[in-house]
Amino acid sequence: MQKYLEKANVLIEALPYIRKFNSKIILIKYGGSAMENEELKHCVMQDIALLKLVGLKPIIVHGGGKDISAMCEKLGVKSEFKNGLRVSDKATTEVASMVLNHINKNLVHSLQNLGVKAIGLCGKDGALLECVKKDENLAFVGTIQKVNSKILEELLEKDFLPIIAPIGMDEDFNTYNINADDAACAIAKALRAEKLAFLTDTAGLYEDFNDKNSLISKISLEQAKILAPKIEGGMHVKLKSCIDACENGVKKVHILDGRVKHSLLLEFFTDEGIGTLVG
């Protein structure tokens, strides 16, 4: 009997959060191990399907860096990085578009199998993500100048769950590879999302990454600004994205460990949460 009561308590604990976030836009940046491990991938898709089916409005922006690198190697296309960003010449950009499109359609299929009306897009569809060249040395890597959010608003209104590949375009319809974190942040800001969640390969934000006891479960925007200069590496960039989002209309940003099964549900629908909440 006790185990049944525990299950009931889990549902009761989730109820106020389901009510609070009903009809709210939730932007999920999907990447890392949660994309590469089939069991984790299925858990993430289940989480997102549940978010949708209980009344939230999730949108997915996905990465695909490791798959792009593997395909470049297979096809003999040179792939190099500068400051953590892939140098994207014409050939590399074509490979990235192909791989991201393949990933996108697989995600659509996974969610449709869970009863969700999912639809796949890239940033060139309907000029969703308009961008300019980020740096001449990076070739066709784009910085987003405009998000045509009306497309997404109309899809949400029609009960679709948009899944977006981070490919953009300039005014001449040239194709650009866009960092998936940047794309997720820009879209969340344009839609003034209730939440932006980054699925990562770390437990969250650490005050000192070498001290695993220094995990920060919650941090205000002002505290995040003070901490940001002290953080190094990829998490520094991630925290800057969190600050940018919170300063531009996104209510809360979450840094979650995508290696933990059902981390999205644990963060959004439980009192303790998991990972780091910014804002």
Curated annotation (Swiss-Prot):
> In chain numbering, where does the site feature Transition state stabilizer fall?
K29, K238
- Supply one GO BP term: arginine biosynthetic process via ornithine
Query: Which pathway is recorded for this entry?
Result: Amino-acid biosynthesis; L-arginine biosynthesis; N(2)-acetyl-L-ornithine from L-glutamate: step 2/4
Q: Name one Pfam family in it.
A: AA_kinase
CDD domains to which the protein is assigned, alphabetical: AAK_NAGK-C
Q: What is its main location?
A: cytoplasm
Tell me what reaction this enzyme catalyses.
N-acetyl-L-glutamate + ATP = N-acetyl-L-glutamyl 5-phosphate + ADP
EC code(s) of this entry: 2.7.2.8
> What's a Gene Ontology MF term here?
ATP binding
What the entry lists under InterPro entries is as follows: AceGlu_kinase-like_sf, AcgluKinase_fam, ArgB, Asp/Glu/Uridylate_kinase, Glu/AcGlu_kinase, NAGK-C
An annotated GO cellular component of this protein is: cytoplasm
NCBIfam families found in the cross-reference section:
argB
What this protein is reported to do is described as: Catalyzes the ATP-dependent phosphorylation of N-acetyl-L-glutamate.
The UniProt family comment states:
Belongs to the acetylglutamate kinase family. ArgB subfamily.
What's the name of the protein? Answer: Acetylglutamate kinase
Organism per entry: Campylobacter jejuni subsp. doylei (strain ATCC BAA-1458 / RM4099 / 269.97)
Q: Cite the source lineage.
A: Bacteria, Pseudomonadati, Campylobacterota, Epsilonproteobacteria, Campylobacterales
